[in-house]
Amino acid sequence: MFFNKKNNQDELKKLAATEAAKSITTEITLGVGTGSTVGFLIEELVNYRDKIKTVVSSSEDSTRKLKALGFDVVDLNYAGEIDLYIDGADECNNHKELIKGGGAALTREKICVAAAKKFICIIDESKKVNTLGNFPLPIEVIPMARSYIARQIVKLGGQPVYREQTITDNGNVILDVYNLKIDNPLKLETELNQITGVVTNGIFALKPADTVIMATKDSNIVVL
């Protein structure tokens, strides 16, 4: 029998997104993340329209999708605190620490996490790891500092690769760092952010997910 891995993974992403949407309560200020899994969440939100008071988005891409479905997206400065933020991840470890930023929205995502009372991360089982770092670590950097930051990362043992033809919503660029040992995500997140010219990096350990909703390959839901 022919097995389509991508279609199956999409089904799992949709399953996790649908489960997370059940956490939406009345009069909620909802933060919406970015990425393929969140795309399924956005589609599901039409069933919760009456409960959502305000929507805050972490990217221009998600904002376009939300507005296309008739949602009024509000700037975080006007929304204030986010009651619930839902987003995906590129990797998630046993401590609910994450690597994010494959979609280049890591800075706004990290701001939304910081402003949220609760952060639910939605993933399929392929994103669950014991140790972070197999997925290249995205770092958003000020363009003029790109080469300088790359040299500092090499000193830390990483192999930075410039993500060509990618400009973030903030007008910056992305370095994807390969082969970086992430034994202590909290320490490395702090260390990388102290390099001059770094806007932020894709490790979410200072404020990890409060809850992880994971769809397994046998189409079950596991809550971490």
Curated annotation (Swiss-Prot):
EC number: 5.3.1.6
GO biological process, alphabetically ordered: D-ribose metabolic process; pentose-phosphate shunt, non-oxidative branch
Superkingdom of the organism of origin: Bacteria
GO cellular component: cytosol
The protein's assembly and partners: Homodimer and homotetramer.
InterPro entries xref list: NagB/RpiA_transferase-like, Ribose5P_isomerase_typA_subgr, Ribose5P_isomerase_type_A
TM spans (from-to): none
SUPFAM superfamilies from the UniProt entry: D-ribose-5-phosphate isomerase (RpiA), lid domain, NagB/RpiA/CoA transferase-like
Signal peptide: none
Gene3D superfamilies reported for this sequence: 3.30.70.260, 3.40.50.1360
Keywords assigned: Isomerase
Role played: Catalyzes the reversible conversion of ribose-5-phosphate to ribulose 5-phosphate.
MF (Gene Ontology): ribose-5-phosphate isomerase activity
Family of this protein: Belongs to the ribose 5-phosphate isomerase family.
Pathway this chain belongs to: Carbohydrate degradation; pentose phosphate pathway; D-ribose 5-phosphate from D-ribulose 5-phosphate (non-oxidative stage): step 1/1
CDD domains: RPI_A (cd01398)
Binding positions for substrate per the UniProt entry: 34-37, 87-90, 100-103, 127
Protein name, as recorded: Ribose-5-phosphate isomerase A
HAMAP family xrefs: Rib_5P_isom_A
PANTHER family: RIBOSE-5-PHOSPHATE ISOMERASE (PTHR11934:SF0)
Catalytic site positions: 109 (proton acceptor)
Catalytic activity: aldehydo-D-ribose 5-phosphate = D-ribulose 5-phosphate
